[in-house]
UniProtKB/Swiss-Prot annotation:
InterPro entries: NAD(P)-bd_dom_sf (IPR036291), Sc_DH/Rdtase_CS (IPR020904), SDR_fam (IPR002347). Substrate binds at S138, Q148. Its EC number is 1.1.1.141, 1.1.1.-, 1.1.1.232. It catalyses: prostaglandin E2 + NAD(+) = 15-oxoprostaglandin E2 + NADH + H(+); (15S)-hydroxy-(5Z,8Z,11Z,13E)-eicosatetraenoate + NAD(+) = 15-oxo-(5Z,8Z,11Z,13E)-eicosatetraenoate + NADH + H(+); (11R)-hydroxy-(5Z,8Z,12E,14Z)-eicosatetraenoate + NAD(+) = 11-oxo-(5Z,8Z,12E,14Z)-eicosatetraenoate + NADH + H(+); lipoxin A4 + NAD(+) = 15-oxo-(5S,6R)-dihydroxy-(7E,9E,11Z,13E)-eicosatetraenoate + NADH + H(+). NAD(+) binds at residues 12-20, 36-37, 63-65, 91, 151-155, 186-188. This is 15-hydroxyprostaglandin dehydrogenase [NAD(+)]. PROSITE patterns: ADH_SHORT. GO terms for biological process: ductus arteriosus closure; female pregnancy; negative regulation of cell cycle; ovulation; parturition; prostaglandin metabolic process; regulation of prostaglandin catabolic process; thrombin-activated receptor signaling pathway. It comes from Bos taurus. Pfam families: adh_short (PF00106).
C-alpha cells in the first residue's frame, strides 16, 4: 500500500513511538488522526506537527482507549472528518504490574476492540476499501519476563490475536492486512516507568536484571520503530507478520512452524 493520500488513525500518538509513527506517516503524505488520553500532550503534539505539515493533515482526539464508547466514537469522528480510514495503528499501551487489570484493558482489550472497529470501517465486506492494521507488541510478547508477567501476557496476547485475526481477515476476503511489531527496549515514557513502585509494585525490588539487559542490548530510538511501521504498510505481501526490531539485528521477522492447514488460510 502506498501511504500517500491515505488516512491513518494512531492511538497513543502524543508521545514516544506513537508520535514517531504519526510523523513518519505525515512525511509519506498521509492524513493522521492523533488519538491519546493525554490532552495536554496531544495538543502540544498537534501544534508541533502543524509547524511542519499543513494543519488540515492532522486531527487530535482525546480518548481513553479502555472506554469502549469513547473508542467507538473516536473511529466515527475520524471517518466523519477525513471521509475514510485506510491505516490503523493500535499503539497505546502502559506498563503497570500493580494495577494489572488496567494493563490488560489498555494493552490487550483495547487492541482487540480497535482492530474490530477498524475492520468494521475498512473491510470490503462492509463496503470499505480494505486497508492495514498494525498492532504494537514487544519482544516481551515473544519471551517470558519475570518482573513483568502481566505486561508480558498482554503482549503475548497481541501476537496471538494479530496472527489469528490476519488469517481470519484473509479467509473472509476483507482486503485488510494485520501485522504486529515487537521491538526491544525503546526510549519512551513507558521505559522510564519500570523505575517506579507505583507501576511495578512488588517487582520493583527485582529490576536489577532488567537494567542490566538494557545496558547490554541498548535502547532503540522511536524513529527506528517508525521505519518498521512503514515497511509493514508498504509491503503488500506481509500479512500476519510479526516484526522484531533490535539494536543488534535491526528489522527482522519472527519465524513460525506452519502446517498445511494454516497455509491454506494465510
Amino acid at each position: 500500500m502506498h501511504v500517500n493520500g491515505k488516512v491513518a488513525l494512531v492511538t497513543g500518538a502524543a508521545q514516544g513511538i506513537g508520535r514517531a509513527f504519526a510523523e513518519a506517516l505525515l512525511l509519506k503524505g498521509a492524513k493522521v488522526a492523533l488519538v491519546d488520553w493525554n490532552l495536554e500532550a496531544g495538543v502540544k503534539c498537534k501544534a508541533a506537527l502543524d509547524e511542519q505539515f499543513e494543519p488540515q493533515k492532522t486531527l487530535f482526539i482525546q480518548c481513553d482507549v479502555a472506554d469502549q464508547e469513547q473508542l467507538r466514537d473516536t473511529f466515527r469522528k475520524v471517518v466523519d472528518h477525513f471521509g475514510k480510514l485506510d491505516i490503523l495503528v493500535n499503539n497505546a499501551g502502559v506498563n503497570n504490574e500493580k494495577n494489572w487489570e488496567k494493563t490488560l484493558q489498555i494493552n490487550l482489550v483495547s487492541v482487540i476492540s480497535g482492530t474490530y472497529l477498524g475492520l468494521d470501517y475498512m473491510s470490503k465486506q462492509n463496503g470499505g476499501e480494505g486497508g492495514i492494521n498494525i498492532n504494537m507488541s514487544s519482544l516481551a510478547g515473544l519471551m517470558p519476563v519475570a518482573q513483568q508477567p502481566v505486561y508480558c501476557a498482554s503482549k503475548h496476547g497481541i501476537v496471538g490475536f494479530t496472527r489469528s485475526a490476519a488469517m481470519a481477515a484473509n479467509l473472509m476476503n476483507s482486503g485488510v492486512r494485520l501485522n504486529a511489531i515487537c521491538p526491544g527496549f525503546v526510549d519512551t515514557p513507558i521505559l522510564k516507568s519500570i523505575e517506579k513502585e507505583e507501576n511495578m509494585g512488588k517487582y520493583i525490588e527485582y529490576m536489577g536484571p532488567i537494567k542490566d539487559m538494557m545496558k547490554y542490548y541498548g535502547i532503540l530510538d522511536p524513529s527506528m520503530i517508525a521505519n518498521g511501521l512503514i515497511t509493514l504498510i508498504e509491503d503488500d505481501a506481509l500479512n500476519g507478520a510479526i516484526m522484531k526490531i533490535t539494536t543488534s539485528k535491526g528489522i527482522h521477522f519472527q519465524d513460525y512452524d506452519t502446517t498445511p492447514f494454516h497455509m491454506k488460510m494465510q
